[in-house]
């Protein structure tokens, strides 16, 4: 097995980012999932060294493996991330497709977020000594909600953070003692972690303190409930940092997940009891195949590829945004101070919101922008950096069916021509219900089944493949939204028609905005010249001699609200 150190490619406007170490098998097998390892706080990727040979022995074959140091640790000690979202985005960039994530402690919490946000490239999740919520949520307690009983008390965590700020060396020594506490192989764990500790207060303290804050910020309870991939969670029964009871409670959040525990193990069971951990992982990998969303992968790739030219080609999309803002928010009044743009693309909708509602840019205002396509998010950030208003926008790379936000985060959400790409519309609307505050609004535009009627009809004269995406009817969208608990306030539909001078012109524009065929049943490979000629002949049946070839769109504008009283939606 060969080892290769790889520096991930960077966008032109930023320096190269994270190192990763890749172990390549001598005889790689196609379509085999790549094992990607993320370490915990206060360590680096070297803590996997003693475990990997035992794991490979249990698996009985070689695997491609990738080991990543978090920013500020190990080979990436000279890198820092401004915030949690930036860190997650950079990690997602270097994780290969068809990955199985294996994370320990903080690495497990980060792996859970990544799996939740990227079902298109992460097929399985394995966590070791990982709590869904590491620190108790004071706001939850203040609101009278049932807290996660198995999280660390905030006062205890604050004492640790303050101790690290005042005396990092002494605090790290204490941390190693906590990780080995209760383990039957306590001396082995202590010696291993001490020998691998590499810390410089001068250069790394700020980055390590930032990483500590991630333990406070991450709340994976919703992510675990929504996770579509198979998952295994391993706990030590004597863990002094993450009680084994957290695993039993996690089973209540996600009944299909595997939860295992190891007697006489503490916080680092892969170090003290490697054979037991390896056996559990081997059993899981053999019985649980990766579950990747190929559709979401195609969506992310299509829109990322279209990002640079999108604004020059998206004439319908801009028109629909203008109509959506006018229809749903044009009557005046306050839209709230914390808003979400779901499927933000290159940010045109945000531009319109900032123009029409300047109060959003006040110090207490905040816009969150989420998209699954990294290229779109990069382009949007670049635009708003140039405009000088990026300070008021939080950018999130993620999946709209598993929103990375706590309950009741937003006063409102706007989403233009995004909902039609949902793989599970009920899950999407349920997530939106969860993320909205009581009384919050959700304004959306989406496409109906008559969209691209002429193109679909022309293709039917040529072959049986699904060349045009399928979209839900207005009644179906309304039914799913109400099933999720949202109330329909207003809606309208329109059928704009765009004209093209040729079929090539139409197809290039669809591809240029990323909206070419995503559905299953499409034809793979390139289209032959004879097939394309038959399509052109069929499409000529709709030719308007004065304006060209028509392309009809069916657009729905829908305004929903979450009831002030949740019982009203029951």
Curated annotation (Swiss-Prot):
Listed GO MF terms: carboxyl-O-methyltransferase activity; carboxylesterase activity; malonyl-CoA methyltransferase activity; S-adenosylmethionine-dependent methyltransferase activity
Catalytic residues as annotated in Swiss-Prot or TrEMBL: 105, 239, 267
Origin superkingdom: Bacteria
Pathway: Cofactor biosynthesis; biotin biosynthesis
Entry-linked CDD domains: AdoMet_MTases
Compositional bias ranges of the Basic and acidic residues kind: 12-25
The reaction(s) this protein catalyses: a carboxylic ester + H2O = an alcohol + a carboxylate + H(+); malonyl-[ACP] + S-adenosyl-L-methionine = malonyl-[ACP] methyl ester + S-adenosyl-L-homocysteine
EC number annotated for this UniProt entry: 3.1.1.1, 2.1.1.197
Record has Transferase as a keyword: yes
Binding sites annotated in the UniProt record for substrate: 41, 105-106, 175-179, 267
GO biological process assignments: biotin biosynthetic process; methylation
InterPro entries: AB_hydrolase_1, AB_hydrolase_fold, BioC, Carboxylesterase_BioH, Methyltransf_11, SAM-dependent_MTases_sf
Stretches for region Malonyl-ACP O-methyltransferase: 280-570
Chain spans, region Disordered: 1-29
Location of the region described as Carboxylesterase in the Swiss-Prot/TrEMBL record: 1-279
Keywords: Biotin biosynthesis, Hydrolase, Methyltransferase, Multifunctional enzyme, S-adenosyl-L-methionine, Transferase
One Pfam family named in its UniProt record: Methyltransf_11
Keyword check for Flavoprotein: no
Biological role stated in the UniProt entry: Converts the free carboxyl group of a malonyl-thioester to its methyl ester by transfer of a methyl group from S-adenosyl-L-methionine (SAM). It allows to synthesize pimeloyl-ACP via the fatty acid synthetic pathway.
UniProt record similarity statement: In the N-terminal section; belongs to the AB hydrolase superfamily. Carboxylesterase BioH family.
NCBIfam families named among the record's database cross-references: BioC (TIGR02072)
Protein name as it appears in the record: Biotin biosynthesis bifunctional protein BioHC
């Amino acid at each position: 097995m060969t080892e290769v150190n790889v520096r991930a490619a960077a966008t032109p406007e930023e320096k190269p980012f994270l190192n990763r170490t890749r172990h390549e098998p001598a005889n790689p097998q196609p379509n085999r999932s790549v094992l990607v390892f993320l370490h915990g706080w206060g360590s680096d990727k070297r803590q996997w060294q003693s475990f990997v040979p035992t794991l490979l022995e249990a698996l009985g074959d070689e695997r491609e493996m990738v080991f990543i140091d978090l920013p500020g640790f190990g080979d990436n000690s000279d890198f820092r991330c401004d915030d949690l979202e930036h860190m997650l985005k950079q990690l997602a960039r270097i994780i290969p497709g068809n990955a199985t994530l294996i994370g320990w402690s903080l690495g497990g919490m980060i792996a859970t977020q990544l799996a939740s946000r990227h079902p298109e490239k992460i097929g399985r999740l394995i966590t070791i000594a990982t709590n869904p919520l590491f620190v108790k949520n004071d706001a939850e307690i203040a609101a009278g909600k049932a807290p996660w009983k198995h999280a660390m008390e905030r006062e205890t965590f604050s004492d640790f953070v303050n101790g690290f700020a005042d005396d990092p060396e002494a605090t790290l020594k204490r941390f190693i003692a906590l990780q080995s506490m209760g383990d039957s192989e306590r001396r082995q764990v202590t010696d291993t972690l001490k020998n691998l500790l590499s810390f410089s207060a001068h250069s790394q303290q700020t980055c390590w303190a930032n990483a500590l804050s991630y333990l406070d910020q991450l709340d994976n309870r919703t992510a675990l409930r929504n996770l579509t991939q198979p998952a295994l969670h391993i706990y030590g029964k004597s863990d002094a940092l993450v009680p084994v009871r957290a695993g039993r409670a996690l089973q209540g959040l996600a009944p299909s997940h595997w939860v295992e525990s190891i007697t006489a193990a503490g916080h680092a069971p892969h170090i003290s009891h490697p054979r037991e951990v390896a056996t559990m992982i081997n059993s899981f990998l053999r019985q649980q195949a990766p579950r990747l969303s190929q559709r979401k992968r195609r969506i992310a790739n299509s829109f990322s590829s279209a990002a640079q030219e999108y604004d020059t080609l998206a004439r319908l999309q801009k028109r629909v945004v203008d109509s959506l803002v006018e229809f749903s928010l044009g009557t005046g009044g306050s839209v709230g101070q914390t808003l979400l743009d779901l499927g933000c693309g290159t940010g045109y909708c945000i531009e319109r919101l900032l123009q029409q509602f300047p109060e959003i840019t006040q110090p207490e205002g905040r816009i969150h922008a989420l998209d699954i396509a990294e290229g779109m998010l990069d382009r949007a950030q670049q635009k708003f950096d140039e405009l000088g208003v990026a300070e008021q926008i939080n950018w999130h790379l993620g999946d709209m069916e598993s929103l990375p936000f706590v309950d009741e985060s937003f006063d409102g959400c706007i989403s233009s021509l995004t909902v039609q790409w949902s793989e599970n519309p009920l899950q999407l609307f349920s997530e939106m219900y969860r993320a909205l505050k009581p009384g919050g609004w959700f304004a959306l535009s989406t496409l109906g089944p008559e969209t691209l009627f002429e193109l679909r009809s022309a293709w039917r004269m040529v072959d049986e493949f699904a060349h045009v995406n399928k979209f839900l009817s207005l009644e179906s969208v309304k039914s799913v939204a109400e099933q999720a608990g949202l109330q329909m306030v207003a809606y309208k539909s329109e059928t704009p028609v765009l004209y093209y001078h040729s079929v090539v012109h139409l197809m290039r524009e669809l591809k240029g905005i990323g909206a070419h065929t995503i559905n299953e049943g499409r034809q793979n490979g390139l289209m032959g010249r004879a097939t394309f000629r038959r399509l052109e002949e069929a499409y000529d049946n709709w030719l308007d001699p004065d304006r060209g070839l028509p392309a009809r769109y069916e657009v729905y504008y829908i305004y929903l609200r979450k009831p002030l009283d949740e019982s009203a939606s029951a």
